[in-house]
Amino acid sequence: MFCAQQINIPPELPDLLKQFTKAAIRTQPHDVLQWSAAYFNALSRGEPLPVKERVEMPVATQKTDTGLTPGLLKILHKQLSSYQSVQPYELEQKWKDLCLPMEQLRSILALDNFGMEVEWIKFFALGCSTLGGSIRSALKHACEILTEDPEGGPARIPFETFTYLYLYLAEIDGEITVSQTESVLNTLQEEVDRQNGMVQPRNFMDALCPPLS
């Protein structure tokens, strides 16, 4: 039997457990054990943690309820955006760590002809499309996830990034013409020039902006 004096409690343990508990409450993982293993593995490696910034309600989209939410996609972006491309097994592991259904990952990957590597920014765009249903909604989600503005702010992102995402999603859609995308981008350019090269959802959701799709 051990007495209280013989039990050595690491001084950092209480704070570590406190932060872990807060993270679990914010993230609300479906599989606590799976998520906990991913949390402490990332913590030990000094990698971005699989933790939401705040509690959020699950999002049911027009297409299907994938279980993916803006908060979870933002976690994936923090974890994987430093790589231009990721191996499918790496993406699969991060997806599992967030307790998301594998069949939905496969359905997203099937939207493009990804090979042995997955270009992250393209997967991110498809994830936003899954969240939003329409291209306009997808790009709004992209702005809100990528922006450095505080929550509730204008959600600005570089126009170059917006253009890449828009043209890629238009290509995947297959029914949006080049003249249509050019009309949208040319219309937005005037606003972008006044905003130091940045675009925000208000610009492309305005009635004066041509339809994105």
What feature does the model see in each segment?
Residues 1-213:
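Phospho-regulatory, low-complexity terminal regions
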